[in-house]
């Protein structure tokens, strides 16, 4: 199923899947030396709230650090990258060359910054793929959410795709909400 036709290229479900898989894989491999594996994906277009992380995941009550970056232009949307808090701390240590003790002394703000930057890189790769397909757009600044067992709802007109990755035994979720041509 395609979102909308463009003079250049159609954005299909497969295109979205390939682009987010490439983005997550490239950023994790380059920045962290990890190679995440896509486990499954799910489509939702009805504007319902986010059940998968809560209802289907054994980590429903695990605290998460969630980075989000938007893109605006010929394609508009948001991408949320969910990391369990413990994995976000490991990623931060690896990304910044810190020990757990150093990170504990520096506090959660450092984890927030690292997850925000990682999310910005992932969404940047995804956005560049959209631009290469004829949908010029630019990024918004990263934001961070922290918590557990919460819901994010999409608007009724947005197409939503949710992708689950395994990265060294940790679940990473990419939640994409987007519209083309508005």
Model-derived features with residue positions:
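N-terminal auxiliary interaction/assembly segments of multi-subunit proteins
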Residues: 1-182
């Amino acid at each position: 199923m395609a979102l909308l036709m463009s003079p250049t290229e159609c954005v299909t479900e497969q295109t979205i899947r390939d682009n987010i898989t490439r983005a997550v894989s490239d950023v994790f491999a380059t920045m962290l030396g990890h190679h995440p594996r896509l486990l499954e994906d799910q489509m939702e277009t009805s504007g319902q709230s986010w059940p998968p992380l809560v209802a289907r995941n054994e980590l429903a009550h695990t605290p998460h650090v969630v980075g989000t970056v938007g893109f605006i232009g010929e394609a508009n949307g948001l991408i949320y990258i969910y990391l369990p808090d413990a994995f976000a701390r490991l990623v931060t240590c690896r990304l910044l060359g810190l020990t757990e003790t150093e990170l504990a002394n520096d506090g959660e703000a450092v984890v927030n910054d690292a997850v925000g930057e990682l999310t910005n890189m992932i969404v940047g790769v995804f956005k560049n793929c959209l631009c290469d397909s004829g949908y010029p757009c630019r990024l918004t600044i990263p934001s961070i959410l922290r918590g557990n067992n919460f819901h994010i709802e999409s608007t009724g007109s947005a197409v939503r795709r949710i992708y689950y990755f395994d990265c060294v035994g940790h679940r990473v979720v990419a939640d994409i909400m987007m519209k083309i041509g508005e």
